[in-house]
C-alpha cells in the first residue's frame, strides 16, 4: 500500500467528531486493515470536564493526558499536561507497525507535549494513510478535510469511509 492519503475531520466542540472518527476506524478494521493510533476522550466528574485521557485505538494503552487536578509545567487552559513518557513510547511502537494511523485529536493540547508532537509529525510525514480529528483552528494543506455539522453527522462516517476505500483501492 503506497498511497499517501490524509483525511481530516474537524468541527465545533461537541458536534460528534470523535464519534464519527471511531465509527470510521471500526469500519476500516472490519475490512481487515491494520490500524493503530490514539484518541483523547474527555473525562467528566459530576457533569464537569476534569481532563482528558489518552488511549490507543486498541484500548490496550491508557493514561491521563491532562487534568485540572494534576500540576505540571505545561498548562493548556485550565488543564495540566500529565502524560507519562512510557505511554507515548508504547503508542509510538504500535504506530510503527500499522498501515493506517488514526489520531484524535491534533490540537493545541496534544501539540504542546513534545514527545506527542514528535509522534504526530512522524505520522504526518512518514505514514501512508492518516485519519485524524483536527482542532477547528488548525488546518493542513494536504489531504481532504471533512467538517462535521449537526446536519451531516449522522451520515458523515459513511462518506468518509467510502472516500478512504475508494482512494486506497
From Swiss-Prot:
CDD domains: RecA-like_Thep1. ATP binds at residues 11-18, 100-107. It is an enzyme of class 3 (hydrolase). The keyword Ribosomal protein does not apply. Pfam families: NTPase_1. The keyword Zinc does not apply. It comes from the Archaea. It catalyses: a ribonucleoside 5'-triphosphate + H2O = a ribonucleoside 5'-diphosphate + phosphate + H(+). InterPro entries: Nuc-triphosphatase_THEP1 (IPR004948), P-loop_NTPase (IPR027417). Keywords: ATP-binding, Hydrolase, Nucleotide-binding. GO terms for molecular function: ATP binding; ribonucleoside triphosphate phosphatase activity. Gene3D superfamilies: P-loop containing nucleotide triphosphate hydrolases. Its EC number is 3.6.1.15. Belongs to the THEP1 NTPase family. Has nucleotide phosphatase activity towards ATP, GTP, CTP, TTP and UTP. May hydrolyze nucleoside diphosphates with lower efficiency. HAMAP family: NTPase_1. This is Nucleoside-triphosphatase THEP1. It comes from Sulfurisphaera tokodaii (strain DSM 16993 / JCM 10545 / NBRC 100140 / 7) (Sulfolobus tokodaii). The lineage of its organism: Archaea, Thermoproteota, Thermoprotei, Sulfolobales, Sulfolobaceae.
Amino acid at each position: 500500500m503506497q498511497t499517501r492519503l490524509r483525511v481530516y475531520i474537524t468541527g465545533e466542540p461537541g458536534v460528534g467528531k470523535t464519534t464519527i472518527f471511531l465509527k470510521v476506524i471500526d469500519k476500516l478494521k472490519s475490512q481487515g486493515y491494520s490500524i493503530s493510533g490514539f484518541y483523547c476522550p474527555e473525562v467528566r466528574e459530576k457533569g464537569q470536564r476534569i481532563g482528558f485521557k489518552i488511549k490507543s485505538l486498541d484500548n490496550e494503552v491508557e493514561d491521563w493526558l491532562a487534568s485540572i487536578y494534576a500540576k505540571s509545567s505545561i498548562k493548556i487552559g485550565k488543564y495540566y499536561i500529565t502524560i507519562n513518557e512510557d505511554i507515548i513510547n508504547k503508542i509510538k511502537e504500535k504506530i510503527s507497525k500499522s498501515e493506517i494511523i488514526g489520531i484524535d485529536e491534533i490540537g493545541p493540547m496534544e501539540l504542546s507535549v513534545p514527545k506527542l508532537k514528535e509522534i504526530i509529525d512522524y505520522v504526518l510525514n512518514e505514514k501512508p494513510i492518516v485519519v485524524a480529528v483536527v482542532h477547528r483552528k488548525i488546518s493542513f494543506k494536504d489531504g481532504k478535510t471533512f467538517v462535521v455539522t449537526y446536519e451531516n453527522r449522522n451520515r458523515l462516517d459513511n462518506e468518509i469511509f467510502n472516500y478512504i476505500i475508494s482512494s486506497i483501492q
